[in-house]
């Protein structure tokens, strides 16, 4: 069976919320929540953290995680994942588990790699969760994805897509959570692809894949996840953790 590696990119120099991966949620660094949830899912053969900052390496060691110190000037989290994956050559599928999703569920992680566990070898997979247009349509921090009839992504956007000119039920539109898995050979190929216009416009790295003519399989999952992008998100995460 194919071996699958999970890498958690943990960039300390976050623009919207600096140092957020080490900010406390109910007394533990956010990164520790992500790491422990990923380990507890029993989905992956190996789990590692990738960061540009020695402070994150030190914090990871304190809670028993393996952390890889990567280059500081990488263009994206996926580039950081790719660099870290070079330390694990026996893993043929590489998953990117976001460092700002402290309550990521086993269901989401299982969905992410389910095509590979079923013997398929798509270039890349991601997960689409429940989408509430009334709440999420105008929120640029909620990334939307629309899919074709075969479950492949047509487009990702921070805007509301599709435009509701006509009321249609059961549209293939999801809340995109930013989890990715790659075949190792495609991840290496991805790193060689130059940034693309739509990627730069939306600031969504996955658009590079679509613009270059490759496919991203979107696996639906009913689970939801809290993403921490702002101080308000962090406050909500702390409130949620205190109720667990």
From Swiss-Prot:
It catalyses: 3-deoxy-alpha-D-manno-oct-2-ulosonate + CTP = CMP-3-deoxy-beta-D-manno-octulosonate + diphosphate. One of its GO terms (molecular function) is 3-deoxy-manno-octulosonate cytidylyltransferase activity. It is found in: Cytoplasm. Gene3D superfamilies: Spore Coat Polysaccharide Biosynthesis Protein SpsA, Chain A. The keyword Nucleotide-binding does not apply. The keyword Nucleotidyltransferase applies. PANTHER family: 3-DEOXY-MANNO-OCTULOSONATE CYTIDYLYLTRANSFERASE, 3-DEOXY-MANNO-OCTULOSONATE CYTIDYLYLTRANSFERASE, MITOCHONDRIAL. HAMAP family: KdsB (MF_00057). This is 3-deoxy-manno-octulosonate cytidylyltransferase. It comes from Synechococcus elongatus (strain ATCC 33912 / PCC 7942 / FACHB-805) (Anacystis nidulans R2). The gene is kdsB.
